[in-house]
Curated annotation (Swiss-Prot):
This is Polyribonucleotide nucleotidyltransferase. Residues 617-679 form the S1 motif domain. Keywords: Cytoplasm, Magnesium, Metal-binding, Nucleotidyltransferase, RNA-binding, Transferase. PANTHER family: POLYRIBONUCLEOTIDE NUCLEOTIDYLTRANSFERASE (PTHR11252), POLYRIBONUCLEOTIDE NUCLEOTIDYLTRANSFERASE 1, MITOCHONDRIAL (PTHR11252:SF0). Residues 549-607 form the KH domain. It catalyses: RNA(n+1) + phosphate = RNA(n) + a ribonucleoside 5'-diphosphate. InterPro entries: ExoRNase_PH_dom1, ExoRNase_PH_dom2, ExoRNase_PH_dom2_sf, KH_dom, KH_dom_type_1, KH_dom_type_1_sf, NA-bd_OB-fold, PNPase. It comes from Hydrogenobaculum sp. (strain Y04AAS1). Mg(2+) binds at D482, D488.
């Protein structure tokens, strides 16, 4: 069964069911142009016990053969998932999870495998649509379909699922997931676009993406898959009502405690007391836990919707108290601590030479070097957990990418600031919105490090409580508001526009009115936080840290690049050995790095001497490299040797190889050979020019 969807002016998308992988519960081959992604769904026979969340896992993988490459590195096969694969797995997972019905506890595994990738269409959005198509055609009672779309803007015009070339010229790159009538997920970056433009882009995508929804509905109508039953979790209605009578007032008392740790302890006490009063057995404990969490959510939502009262007593638009500590650490090249309520981020900046850039392999560009990196760490102690600290999890990689995307558009060009930049954010304490605290702390630390950022960047997380047509948008959400609410909408940017956005929801979609209010409220909050950042450090420091390496970039004429490098890298090695400076040639740019500015200047002077042209009439201090009876061979610039004939010397002292003398360039002949003389030499008017065979008995060559 194959269905087709037309998407704007791009190649059509084809969705083919059950062509491959027949042992899976369902499989979809989705393609656009030369890009093909195989998506499979596998479902366990029996539901899992003791969990209150959808046991869904999503894995996205790319094979190097998909774009005709062999994996780089010593081992020529794919290994653990790359950051790109992790990020795409998250983008697929996030819109699917809210549409898994509560009570369906069978384990569901969605696997997306890119089999072919052309140089036009990114497989990530195809994988989102393919995953939805695989689920609606499987035995999973998935409440879809949804579709994945990419929206860009080129020269003021929105483009759906743009090609790679179009994306390079775009001022925004937004991946979104949509249902039949609403937006369900947003992820993307922009170059300071206004909120109204972002909103227009999203609803343009919602309109154009309906062809993919209709194609999946056509697929389901044809296949008519049989769905597995949905179970019930939680206490019976009678027991749930008794729990509400016993625990409601005490839960509300606990909610009034501002401190997260104390509030959590109070809720645990209420939980234990209610469990004892109701006589809950060990076998009933899981159902009791589910109902207790449902009651917490219900009470919190009622307090906000009816009384506009939040857990910590704030109003819906209030931001928690903000404190900033600049340069708390001496040796890192830049550092800052940003604290908002009980969320605290320590950001540090490290500057490094170009040869320390991160090598990455991408579908469209092959091997490239990444200049700016932001790594986000979420240690267990940030939430008071007693567990070992392992390698970065998917969430940490995702939050780091979100913050990196927010800050990167404001960095100076590499030609103006020739450093590799690494920002590390360690979350020291967390109670909601640690990724947006990372954006703020990262901006402060970059200013502290002397990175010439164009502007400060700040971020804020927005929440939503919705019941029918009644809704409240919350600014600067707590962890509990994120957990028990309907939306986590993160927006980062400058005073002039949005640079990064991420939205996840737990309901089936958001209306345009909600999106407008959320973006406008987020803008007000962002302006407030930006004022705090500018108060702390109004502009980047003029100089980098004394502990940072020193750097300079030089423009090299294209025809001189080989001369600068030298045979087998001779000149680059000489600069390293002689001055302690490293040189990286990239196109027509030479990037010089050294521990001191003196070493950088010496290396730059040497490179200038290599590319400098010898001028007739110019006086140079040269090095004698050969002595003959008829004159001296003098190197006036590296690689440029001329003859100082005995007849052109005003004095004839004893000179040895290695001595330095001042010489003047009399002439450059048609073979680019240099004729030299003493600086004060005056050629007699009637003196004949020395014969060529006298001047040049031996061929000149570079030493």
């Amino acid at each position: 069964m194959i269905v087709k969807a037309e998407i704007g002016n791009q190649d059509p998308i084809y969705i083919e069911a059950n062509k491959y992988a027949h042992q899976a519960d369902s499989s979809i081959l989705i393609s656009q142009g030369g890009t093909k992604v195989l998506v499979t769904v596998c479902v366990s026979e029996e539901p899992l016990c003791g969990i209150d969340f959808a046991p869904l896992s999503v894995d996205y993988r790319e094979r190097s053969f998909a774009w005709g490459k062999i994996p780089g590195g010593f081992i020529k096969r794919e290994g653990k998932p790359t950051d790109r694969e992790v990020l795409i797995s998250r983008v697929i997972d996030r819109p699917l999870r809210p549409l898994m019905p509560k009570g369906f506890l069978n384990e569901v595994v969605v696997t997306c495998l890119t089999l072919s990738a052309d140089d036009k269409y990114d497989p990530d959005v195809l994988a989102i649509t393919g995953a939805s198509a695989a689920l609606v055609s499987s035995s999973v009672p998935f409440e879809g379909p949804i579709a994945g779309m990419r929206v860009c803007r080129v020269n003021g015009e929105f483009i759906i699922n743009p090609t790679y070339e179009q994306r390079k010229n775009s001022d925004m790159d937004i991946v979104m997931a949509l249902s039949k009538d609403a937006i369900v997920m947003v992820e993307g970056g922009a170059k300071e676009v206004e909120e109204s433009v972002l909103l227009d882009a999203l609803f343009f995508g919602l309109e154009k993406g309906q062809t993919l929804i209709k194609a999946q509905e056509e697929l389901v109508d044809s296949l008519k898959p049989e769905k597995k039953p949905i179970g019930h979790i939680g206490l019976s209605d009678d027991m749930a009502n008794k729990l509400k009578e016993i625990a409601s007032s005490k839960i509300l008392e606990a909610f009034s405690i501002e401190d997260k740790k104390e509030r959590s302890k109070a809720l645990k006490d209420v939980y234990a007391q209610a469990m004892q009063k109701l006589g809950i057995s060990k076998e009933q404990e899981f159902d009791f836990l589910v109902s207790f969490k449902d009651l917490e959510s219900q009470l919190m939502r009622e307090q906000i919707l009816k009384y506009k009262k939040r857990i910590d007593g704030r109003k819906e638009t209030d931001i928690r108290p903000i404190t900033i500590e600049m340069h708390p650490l001496e040796r890192p090249h830049g550092s800052a601590v940003f604290t908002r309520g009980q969320t605290q981020a320590l950001a540090t900046v490290t500057l490094a030479p170009k040869d320390e850039a991160q090598l990455v392999e991408t579908i469209f560009e092959g091997e490239t070097f990444k200049r700016f990196m932001l790594h986000y760490n979420f240690p267990p102690f940030s939430t008071g957990e007693a567990r070992p600290w392992g390698p970065p999890r998917r969430r940490e990689i995702g939050h780091g990418a979100l913050a990196e995307r927010a800050l990167e558009p404001l960095l100076a060009k590499e030609e103006d600031f020739p450093y590799i930049i690494r920002v590390v954010s360690d979350i020291l304490e967390s109670n909601g919105s640690s990724s947006m605290a990372t954006v703020c702390a990262g901006s402060l630390a970059l200013f502290d490090a002397g990175v010439p950022m164009k502007k400060h960047v700040a971020g804020i997380a927005m929440g939503l409580i919705k019941d029918g047509d009644n809704f409240v948008i919350l600014t600067d959400i707590l962890g509990d508001e994120d957990h028990l609410g309907d939306m986590d909408f993160k927006v980062a940017g400058t005073r002039d526009g949005v640079t990064s956005v991420q939205m996840d929801i737990k309901i089936k979609g958001l209306s345009k009115d909600i999106m407008i209010k959320a973006l406008n409220q987020a803008k007000e909050a962002r302006m407030f936080i930006l004022d705090k950042l500018y108060e702390a450090i109004p502009e980047p420091n003029k100089e980098v840290s004394k502990y940072a390496p020193k750097a300079q970039v030089m423009k090299i004429p294209e025809d001189k690049v080989g001369l600068v490098i030298g045979p087998a890298g001779k000149n680059i090695k000489y600069i390293k050995e002689q001055f302690g400076a490293s040189v990286w040639i990239d196109g027509a740019n030479a990037y010089i790095n050294a521990p001191t500015i003196e070493a950088v200047n010496k290396a730059a002077d040497f490179i200038n001497s290599l590319i400098q042209e010898v001028e007739v009439g110019g006086v140079y201090e040269g090095k004698v490299i050969r002595v003959e009876n008829y004159g001296l061979f003098v190197e006036v610039l590296p690689g440029k040797v001329g003859l100082l004939h005995a007849s052109a010397m005003t004095e004839k002292p004893t000179i040895n190889v290695g001595d330095t003398i001042k010489v003047k360039v009399m002439a450059i002949d048609e073979q680019n050979r240099l004729n030299l003389c003493s600086p004060d030499y005056q050629k007699p008017e009637n003196q004949e020019r020395p014969r060529k065979e006298q001047l040049n008995r031996k061929p000149h060559h570079r030493k």
